Regions:
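Cys-nucleophile CN-hydrolase/nitrilase-fold catalytic domain and related Cys-dependent amidase chemistry
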Residues: 23-106, 110-112, 182-201
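Residue-level recognition of beta-strand->loop/alpha-helix junctions
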Residues: 7-9, 39-41, 114, 210
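Active-site catalytic loop in hydrolytic enzyme cores
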Residues: 91-171, 184-193, 197, 259-266
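CN hydrolase (nitrilase-like) catalytic-core segments centered on the catalytic cysteine
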Residues: 61-82, 150, 159-248
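Short, basic, glycine/proline-bearing loop/turn elements
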Residues: 8-12, 51-58, 149-151, 178-183
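A conserved C-terminal secondary-structure "cap"
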Residues: 257-281
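N-terminal phosphate-binding loop and adjacent alpha-helix
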Residues: 7-24
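Extreme N-terminal starter segment of soluble prokaryotic enzymes
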Residues: 1-4
């Protein structure tokens, strides 16, 4: 499975960020070995001046520029695209949803996942933050099939909850994706650590696509960590990005996943935790 993580940077307008993301995706498709699957970061289309402005600009999911671009791109290039995350307006709700949507080679929707664990924290150096003030959490654990491979996904803060990743493995996931927008403080300390740990404990390849770059708002600089990584099921970092815009590509060996699971059959050997999801196999 040939994959590409399209690391884009923070922006304050979809009119700026969506075309930039599309240009990076177009460049990735010019490679001699074209990817089968592309992923963008969390908040790739709009980071927002603040929470209120992000909510004010939200539209119904299928009407957003980010959704329309990703769907058209998938159909045009016959490639699967995971459109990072999009803030989507929900009828009758004051809060929006943080949704990642996956398109197949014909632009059909393969999956939609709504972020379950929201980033509500006390002051770690940049002041407190409560994502739940403006985002409605999801509830569903989501997997999908593409080219004979089972994918699962989580979003950013979800990465701190290994039980979600175990549930994805039990639902049959072989590749797990993680669009994210980590802070500089948490990113430097935990981002790659979590990516490798989640890959090892699930015996899945993991594509962690992080938003990078910085914006200045009212004289204050806001930054997102970036440093996307593609990690194999053994926990080896195959590719690693920096802080700016960058595209990572890798060919994921699906036979390695099955070999590891047969060699270290952790799902069969579990004793301390009851089933939350019935194993797929």
């Amino acid at each position: 499975m040939k994959v590409a993580a399209i690391q884009t940077v923070m922006g304050l307008s979809p009119e700026e960020t969506v075309p930039a993301a599309e240009a990076a995706m177009e460049a990735a498709m010019q490679a001699a070995e074209k990817p089968d699957f592309l992923i963008l970061p969390e908040y790739f289309s709009y980071y927002g001046l603040d929470q209120k402005s992000a909510v004010a600009l939200a539209q119904p999911l299928a009407e957003t520029p980010a959704y329309r671009m990703a769907q058209a791109f998938a159909k045009r290039h016959k490639v699967s695209v995971q459109a990072g995350t999009i803030l989507a307006k929900v009828e009758g709700e004051a809060r929006v949803e943080n949704v990642t949507v996956v398109f197949g080679r014909e632009g059909e929707v393969l999956a939609e996942y709504r972020k379950i664990h929201l980033f509500d924290i006390d002051d770690l150096g940049n002041g407190p933050f409560r994502e739940s003030d403006y985002i409605k959490p999801g509830n569903d654990i989501v997997t999908w099939e593409f080219d004979g491979v089972t994918f699962g996904t989580a979003i950013c803060f979800d990465g701190r909850f290994p039980e979600l990743f175990r549930a994805l493995r039990l639902k049959g996931a072989q590749i797990i994706t993680l669009p994210a927008a980590y802070t500089m403080i948490t990113g430097e300390a935990h981002w790659e650590l979590f990516a490798r740990a989640r890959a090892v404990e699930t015996q899945c390849h993991l594509i962690a696509c992080g938003l990078g770059g910085s914006v200045v708002v009212d004289g204050e600089t806001k930054s997102s960590y970036g440093h996307s990584v593609i990690v194999d099921a053994w926990g080896t970092v195959l590719k690693r990005a920096g802080h700016g815009p960058e595209t990572l590509t890798a060919t994921l060996d699906m036979a390695q996943v099955e070999k590891l699971r047969k060699g270290i059959p952790v799902i069969r050997q579990r004793r301390l935790v009851g089933e939350t999801v019935t194993p797929a196999n």
